[in-house]
Amino acid sequence: MKKVKEAEKRNIKRKKRIRDRIGFGVAERPRVTIFKSNKYFYAQVIDDIVGHTLASVSTIEKELSLNKNISDVKKLGEVLAKRLKDKNISKLIFDRNGYKYHGLIAGFATALREAGIDV
């Protein structure tokens, strides 16, 4: 049990360190944050000043019906980029939420960049 609590403390410390480094998302440049569960992948764009979610996308959405693999996560990045362009948002702050920048996370960020979003 002690190892689990220590790991949680390290994860929280890592997230806080990343969040302090990247800053807050504002209306001109909101923050896109990532969450991975064992089955699904979630991303949401947040305006931290107001505290609102501006856009979100996940593999759990029925109309997308995607799995949690790199090719499907890249499709999620394209869908999110389209939703952001509809709202005239072209710049984001990328919050990897403590995850390493490889695999799904890197694929998602690459798809956003290829779709024309400045991350």
Curated annotation (Swiss-Prot):
Example GO molecular function: 5S rRNA binding
Pfam annotation, one family: Ribosomal_L18p
Spans through the membrane: none
Coiled coil: none
InterPro entries to which the protein is assigned, alphabetical: Ribosomal_uL18_bac-type, Ribosomal_uL18_bac/euk
GO (cellular component) term, any one: cytosolic large ribosomal subunit
Record's keyword terms, sorted: Ribonucleoprotein, Ribosomal protein, RNA-binding, rRNA-binding
One Gene Ontology term from the biological process aspect of the record: translation
PANTHER family documented for this protein: 39S RIBOSOMAL PROTEIN L18, MITOCHONDRIAL (PTHR12899), LARGE RIBOSOMAL SUBUNIT PROTEIN UL18M (PTHR12899:SF3)
Family statement drawn from the similarity comment of this UniProt entry: Belongs to the universal ribosomal protein uL18 family.
Subunit details: Part of the 50S ribosomal subunit; part of the 5S rRNA/L5/L18/L25 subcomplex. Contacts the 5S and 23S rRNAs.
Main function: This is one of the proteins that bind and probably mediate the attachment of the 5S RNA into the large ribosomal subunit, where it forms part of the central protuberance.
Protein name: Large ribosomal subunit protein uL18
Species for this entry: Borrelia duttonii (strain Ly)
Upper lineage: Bacteria, Pseudomonadati, Spirochaetota, Spirochaetia, Spirochaetales
Protein's gene: rplR
